[in-house]
A protein has these predicted regions:
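A short beta-strand-turn-helix
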Residues: 3-20, 61
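Thiol-based oxidoreductase modules, predominantly thioredoxin-like and allied folds used
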Residues: 6, 37-62
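Residue-level signature of catalytic and energy-coupling elements of molecular machines
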Residues: 11, 23, 40, 56, ...
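Short pre-active-site segment immediately N-terminal to redox-active cysteine/selenocysteine motifs
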Residues: 19, 25-29, 71
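Hydrophobic beta-strand anchors of alpha/beta hydrolase catalytic cores
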Residues: 22-23, 52, 75
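Conserved redox-active cysteine motifs that mediate thiol-disulfide chemistry
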Residues: 25-39
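Structural micro-motif
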Residues: 61, 67-76
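Non-catalytic, surface beta->alpha helical segment in thiol-disulfide oxidoreductase systems
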Residues: 79-104
Length: 104
């Protein structure tokens, strides 16, 4: 499954529809965000139990504020609608997969 788009308006629906949701807060001008984007695409294909959503903070600023996002990329991992873990900054695929497995 490819990554999907998250918006301020669709986020609550995404939480309800997907058992495990990784919401990536990013912006097009953010170097580390664009660096980690291909890794997130790969993980979305390999770990099909996780839905990965991308939330552009420039276009949709309310949700990042609600969750206290101060730097990007920030990834919030939700399971059954509850926030389970937060990861800030770009990281290697190995580290990201390990973090996901530890928290799901």
């Amino acid at each position: 499954m490819a990554t999907i788009k998250s918006t301020d308006d669709t986020f609550e629906t995404l939480l309800k529809e997907h058992k495990i949701l990784l919401n990536d807060f990013w912006a097009p001008w953010c170097g580390p965000c664009t660096q980690i984007a291909p890794t997130l695409e790969e993980i979305s294909e390999e770990m099909k139990e996780i839905t990965i959503a991308k939330h552009n903070i420039d276009d949709e600023p309310n949700l990042p504020t609600k969750y206290g996002v101060r730097g990007i990329p920030t990834m919030l991992l939700f399971k059954d609608g509850e926030l389970k873990a937060t990861k800030v900054g770009a990281t290697s695929k190995t580290d990201l997969v390990s973090w996901l497995k530890e928290n799901i």
